[in-house]
Amino acid sequence: PYLPWSEAHAWWMHGSIRSDDAYKGGSGVSDQSAWHDMEVFSSVTANVGNNDGPWFKGYVAISRYNLALYALSKVTDENYPLKGVRTGEVKFLRGATYFFMKTLWRYIPWVDEENGRTVEDVTNISNRPNGTDDTYLWEHIVADLEEAVRLLPEKQEEIGRINKNAARAMAAKALLFMAYKQDARHQVVEVDKKILERALVYINEITDQEGGNVGLCEDFAENFLPEYDNATKEAIWEIQYSINDGTSSGGNTNNGAELNAPSWEPYFPCCDFHKMSFNMANAFRTGTDGLPLFDTFNDAEMKGRFKEYFDENSFDPRLSHTAAIPGYPYKYNPDLLY
């Protein structure tokens, strides 16, 4: 469905601006002030649209997955030969959606096709049953994704459908998060190596296909240019959107992504959000050997001399994809200077 910016599930607004990677941007502090509050971690209000929207739309999606799984449980493989594959697809979607929500809010109510059949059932579900920690949530998420790995085929004929590699990748990612145990202040206090080993199994199953089903593009830009949609080996799974499809909103799009561009007429009339931090820009610095400066990348300060700064230092070329820098090529066209 169409996702307006206030309801979008997008890492830039819920991840980058909450970290040291980016600033909110926009026309000022009052422009989407809820995101500013998240950036400075002050006066965060849970029921403001920009905060409540992703929660609401997340559970709208969860409700649909649960209805689909309940309906699938009522048919037989004989009557519906695709039952297993479709169940795997929905399990993946539910696991991936819960993963996103779990990383944002940590303690969330787990609602599934068994415990959330009625409004009353859902109302009575706690986000911390019996005061438990969040391990049980990770276990549910991983269980969904591992079931998807079991049920899904290696290849799907229809574009956009989830395959086994997508489930492997998502299961590995969830296990990696689960392995790093955190205390109440989100500090890592333990690393569970057995869980890391479980993640490594799925990772190896993907990387063992390098040169065949998966691999790196010869040109980094191919991951982002529209002519390569659904056609690169780097893409594990691509969400499908549509425009000019007859809907009242003009398309089924993730509107939050539309704010993620510099305000630059005539190319982008809006909206100048998601401004890269100096720390993030510095992270692209390299030594004379072209390798990252892991320990010293943030030692230099621009102090208003950005032109000299970029001339005097060397950077990973992917910086041009990530940031719009005045006087330098924008994205992948060397003749288009920002």
Regions found by a protein language model. Give the residues of each.
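Intrinsically disordered, low-complexity regions
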Residues: 38-41, 119-122, 256, 281, ...
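An aromatic- and glycine-enriched ligand-binding surface/loop that stacks and positions planar moieties
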Residues: 1-33, 108, 146-147, 161-168, ...
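General structural signal for secondary-structure boundaries
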Residues: 79, 114-117, 122-126, 132-133, ...
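Conserved, well-structured interaction surfaces
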Residues: 1-6, 27-105, 126-139, 143-159, ...
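Short coil/linker segments at helix-helix boundaries
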Residues: 107-135, 181-198
